[in-house]
């Protein structure tokens, strides 16, 4: 006879699967987008208006004051009310409806910028929104040169950027770039029109170094390198703009250099720390780069020497002389030491004492 236990287990398991399938077939789960400040009404799936239901938000029961029959009413929603909302039937707690509420705003006009930092290879365009929407956005960009639509290859990083390769150099035909941003609550767009030469802007110079010039207290030697992104400095040379100032002042001094990647500052204040930056630009077209990373340097200063003053010499001589003077000799009687009979008496007394000692030793 077959064991009835496995058969019973199979029946129970089948029943669980059927109930699970029924519950999920009865529920409607999706994402619902609403604007900040809107009034939101949620219906509990196919349940009647007067059905007994329970609503939860992120697993927490919602007070009945927000219900109109079986409908959930949310007034003037804000960002904090985003989350998962679920509706259950009566006391059985059968899930009848589930939605994820996303509260946000439609996009404002995007900020679009196009620039060529590797001329003549091509240019790139980057964009961002002036303020967050709090919900997902999608961006679409189109680039048209004359009657030709060009491909803008999206960069992996940063994600809101793409680059375009020049198909024709020195063209007088303008480029037209249109960016459209869309989300579940609306869309917006912006357009740029420009000449090829107008967007040329190199990256800042690299490896800027400033150091003092030996034996020159008013000079600083500054050197730098072309930006590594500039592909052909021989055919498309750069010129440079140097600015510098001592930290004690706010006013910059400037020098424009048409060639070379070094310069000697000759009017620095001796002993004062300087801050120095360099910018770059194509010799003929485009605009100046941003400033390089600031470097600091101080002009050469002479090592202080030990100077001995005349007073120090006198004191040293006096001290040395006194240290080698013989100790004073005590005299029994000095002719000029005493004044009057008192002094004479002292001398005679001392003489008699010495004479007495002499007699004893004879």
From Swiss-Prot:
Which Cys pairs are S-S linked? Answer: 44-87
Residues annotated as glycosylated are 58, 68, 140, 188
- Taxonomy, superkingdom: Eukaryota
> What Gene Ontology molecular-function terms does this entry list?
interleukin-11 binding; interleukin-11 receptor activity
InterPro entries xref list: FN3_dom, FN3_sf, Hematopoietin_rcpt_L_F3_CS, Ig-like_dom, Ig-like_dom_sf, Ig-like_fold, Ig_sub2, Type-I_Cytokine_Rcpt
- Pro-peptide positions? 335-362
State the compartments where it is located: Cell membrane
Where is the major localization of this protein?
Answer: membrane
Q: Which tissues is it found in, per the record?
A: Highly expressed in nervous system. Also found in skeletal muscle.
Q: Name one GO biological process term.
A: ciliary neurotrophic factor-mediated signaling pathway
Does this entry carry the keyword Thylakoid? no
Cite the Ig-like C2-type domain residue spans from the record.
23-103
Q: SUPFAM superfamilies recorded for this chain? A: Fibronectin type III, Immunoglobulin
Instruction: Please list every transmembrane segment annotated in the UniProt record, as residue ranges.
Output: none
Question: Which Gene Ontology terms of cellular component type are present?
Answer: ciliary neurotrophic factor receptor complex; CNTFR-CLCF1 complex; external side of plasma membrane
Membrane topology, as annotated:
Lipid-anchor; GPI-anchor
Domain Fibronectin type-III, which positions?
106-203, 204-304
Task: List where the motif WSXWS motif lies.
Answer: 288-292
Asked whether the keyword Nucleus is assigned, the reply is no
Q: Name one Pfam family in it.
A: fn3
Keywords from the UniProt entry? Cell membrane, Disulfide bond, Glycoprotein, GPI-anchor, Immunoglobulin domain, Lipoprotein, Membrane, Receptor, Repeat, Signal
How it assembles, according to the record, is: Heterotrimer of the alpha subunit, LIFR and IL6ST.
**Domains: entry comment:** The WSXWS motif appears to be necessary for proper protein folding and thereby efficient intracellular transport and cell-surface receptor binding.
Q: Describe the function of this protein.
A: Binds to CNTF (GPA). The alpha subunit provides the receptor specificity.
The UniProt similarity line reads:
Belongs to the type I cytokine receptor family. Type 3 subfamily.
Specify the protein name: Ciliary neurotrophic factor receptor subunit alpha
Q: What is the lineage of its organism?
A: Eukaryota, Metazoa, Chordata, Craniata, Vertebrata
* Gene label: CNTFR
């Amino acid at each position: 006879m077959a064991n009835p236990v496995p058969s019973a287990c199979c029946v129970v398991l089948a029943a669980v699967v059927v109930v699970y399938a029924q519950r999920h077939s009865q529920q409607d789960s999706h994402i619902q987008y609403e604007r900040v400040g809107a009034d939101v009404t949620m219906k509990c799936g196919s349940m009647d208006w007067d059905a007994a239901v329970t609503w939860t938000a992120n697993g927490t029961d919602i007070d009945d004051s927000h219900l109109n029959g079986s409908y959930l009413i949310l007034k003037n929603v804000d960002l904090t009310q985003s989350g998962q909302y679920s509706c259950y039937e009566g006391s059985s707690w059968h899930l009848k409806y589930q939605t994820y509420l996303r509260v946000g705003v439609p996009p404002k006009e995007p900020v679009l910028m196009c620039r060529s930092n590797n001329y003549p290879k091509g240019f790139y365009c980057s964009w961002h929104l002036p303020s967050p929407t709090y919900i997902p956005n999608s961006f679409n960009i189109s680039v048209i040169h004359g009657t030709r639509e060009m491909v803008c290859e999206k960069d992996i990083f940063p994600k809101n950027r793409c680059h375009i390769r020049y198909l024709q150099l020195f063209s007088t035909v303008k480029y037209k770039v249109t960016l459209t941003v869309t989300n579940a609550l609306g869309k917006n767009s912006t357009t740029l029109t420009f000449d090829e030469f107008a967007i040329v802007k190199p990256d800042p110079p690299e490896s800027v170094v400033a150091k003092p010039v030996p034996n020159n207290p008013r000079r600083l030697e500054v050197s730098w390198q072309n930006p590594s992104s500039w592909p052909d400095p021989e055919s498309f040379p750069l010129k440079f703009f140097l600015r510098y100032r001592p930290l004690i002042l706010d006013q910059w001094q400037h020098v424009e250099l048409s060639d070379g990647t070094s310069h000697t500052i000759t009017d620095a204040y001796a002993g004062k720390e300087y801050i120095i930056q360099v910018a770059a630009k194509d010799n003929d077209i485009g605009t100046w780069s941003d400033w390089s990373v600031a470097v600091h340097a101080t002009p050469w200063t002479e090592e202080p020497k030990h100077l001995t003053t005349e007073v120090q010499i006198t004191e040293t001589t006096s001290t040395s002389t006194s240290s080698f003077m013989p100790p004073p000799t005590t005299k029994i009687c000095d002719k000029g030491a005493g004044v009057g009979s008192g002094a004479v008496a002292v001398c005679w007394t001392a003489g008699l004492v010495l004479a007495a000692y002499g007699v004893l030793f004879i």
